[in-house]
Each structure stands twice: as structure tokens, then as C-alpha cells.
A protein has these predicted regions:
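Alpha-helical membrane segments of multi-pass proteins
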Residues: 1-285
């Protein structure tokens, strides 16, 4: 009852699809990230990011801005758990590949001169560690007490989204690393990595979808949209995490498979092949 009373203190009472609530924390964070990227790009002499890389990075920042402000943000925070799952999947599965694809390796390499980064980066970007960090973060924040805490306190919600984003970038690193010093998994390793990545997310999703009770009661206190009950909303949210989330990784596996075949036919560069790790298991050595 206390949680419900606190939730009712939130200002949103009606959802306006054309309303944009701009959050300063989001604007500041994205502005700083964009400034650092384009400042570094301008300082490069003849080796700046390609047009495609600039577009990819900018698209990642723009997508983050869209999902963390405006109608989807309000839908996620005040009305529907299923809306929050859409927001989180975009943050975890679409934004990080855009940011990584848009960042050339030379732009990141100077950070490896810092002793802490040089020591830490090779340890947290291996397949097993990236897998563990992402899935521990996923499970941690979907515990009902912590999830509800993030909904009630904006600063906690900021921490939740930051940890999701960082963990997701790490999760994608063994598949997309632009740095030979922190190489990708081999193609077979990438396929295995994508497969096992579906398992913890599926377990969490099935638990949420099949729960007998409403795990996140704050949504039960919000105005109902489109006649969706809190229990049905939770079921839909679990299915969104389970089915699109799982299918996404199978889609990535398909892309990796065809890239692997291209390498066998001489279509991929030797440098990329040399930059791959031997296997998913070997990545932890």
C-alpha cells in the first residue's frame, strides 16, 4: 500500500503521444558523449570516422534520446510494464551496436594507455565475462524490490539505465569489437555466444510472464490503458522480452554464420580473422 501511495504522487495522469518531457540528465549525458565523439573525430588528421560511422553513432544517440524522453518514457514509467520492456530491449539490443559500429578502433585506443583501463578492459570484454556482467545486471534490476525502487526514484532509475547501457555495450563487444587489442570471438564462438545469451533472458522472461501475481505492483496503481489489466500487461512484457529478445539473437547468429561462410570463401579480411578469439571458452583464458 505504501508503494502504491508513493506511485500516485507521480505527476503523469494521462498519456499524451505528442508530449515530450525532456530530462536534463539525459540531455547532458548525450551531449557530453556526442561532444567527446565529434571533438575526437575533428582532431583526427585524415583518419576520421567514415560517414557511415558518424551516422551510426549519431543514430545511437538519437535513439537513446527518443526512448528516454517523451511518450515512450511516460508509457514505460507510469503506465505499462510492457512498454518498459520495449524501451529496455531497444537500449540493450539496438543502441549499443550502433554506438560500437560508429566508433573506430583508433578513437578508443588512447584509453588503453591508462593503467586501470589496460588492466581491466581485457578482463571484462571476454565472452564469459561480458555474458556474466550483462545477465547479472539484467536479473538484478528485474528483482521486484529493485525494479519498483527505480520507478519510484528518478536517480535510481538513471543508475538502472546507465548500468543497462554499459552492460549491453560489454555484451556486444565480443561480437563487434573495433580493437584488435580487445578482439572479437571467432565466428563459431560468436554463434555459441549468441545462443547461450538467449538462455538467461528467456528464464527471466518466462518467470515474469508466468508469475501468478503482479510482480511490479506500481503498474497496478496506474491508470489503465486500452483495457490492459496489470496481469496481462506483465504477461505481454514477459513475452516481449522472451520472443523478440530471443529471435534477435538468432538473427545475429544468422548474420555471423553468413560472415563465417564469406571468410571461408575469402570474402572477409585476414586482419579480422586474426583479430578474433579462438572460441567462446578460450576467451576466458
Amino acid at each position: 500500500m505504501v508503494l502504491r501511495a508513493l506511485f500516485l504522487l507521480h505527476p503523469a495522469q494521462t498519456l499524451a503521444w505528442n508530449a515530450w518531457t525532456i530530462h536534463p540528465s539525459t540531455v547532458i549525458g548525450l551531449t557530453v558523449l556526442g561532444w567527446l565523439y565529434f571533438r575526437r573525430a575533428r582532431s583526427a588528421e585524415g583518419i576520421g570516422p567514415s560517414t557511415g560511422q558518424r551516422v551510426a553513432f549519431s543514430a545511437g544517440l538519437l535513439l537513446l534520446f527518443v526512448i528516454l524522453n517523451g511518450p515512450l518514457h511516460d508509457l514505460s514509467d507510469f503506465y505499462l510494464f510492457s512498454g518498459h520492456m520495449v524501451q529496455h530491449l531497444i537500449m540493450e539490443l539496438i543502441v549499443p551496436p550502433l554506438l560500437i559500429a560508429g566508433t573506430p578502433g583508433w578513437m578508443l585506443r588512447p584509453a588503453l594507455r591508462w593503467p586501470v583501463v589496460r588492466w581491466l578492459a581485457p578482463r571484462i570484454t571476454t565472452g564469459p565475462m561480458a555474458f556474466a556482467i550483462f545477465n547479472v545486471t539484467l536479473c538484478f534490476w528485474h528483482l521486484p524490490a529493485l525494479y519498483n525502487l527505480a520507478l519510484l526514484h528518478h536517480n535510481v532509475h538513471i543508475v538502472q539505465h546507465l548500468t543497462f547501457l554499459i552492460a549491453s555495450v560489454l555484451m556486444w563487444w565480443p561480437l563487434m569489437s573495433p580493437l584488435p587489442e580487445l578482439p572479437r570471438l571467432s565466428f563459431p564462438g560468436q554463434m555459441l555466444y549468441c545462443f547461450v545469451m538467449t538462455l538467461p533472458m528467456s528464464v527471466v522472461a518466462i518467470y515474469i510472464a508466468m508469475a501468478d501475481t503482479v510482480l511490479y505492483p506500481l503498474y497496478a496503481s496506474s491508470p489503465r490503458l486500452w483495457g490492459i489489466s496489470p496481469k496481462m500487461d506483465q504477461l505481454i512484457g514477459g513475452l516481449i522480452m522472451w520472443i523478440p529478445g530471443g529471435l534477435f539473437f538468432y538473427g545475429v547468429m544468422t548474420v555471423v554464420f553468413f560472415r563465417w561462410q564469406r571468410q571461408g570463401n575469402g570474402g572477409d579480411s585476414v586482419a579480422e580473422a586474426q583479430g578474433s578469439r579462438g572460441s567462446f571458452a578460450a576467451a576466458g583464458d
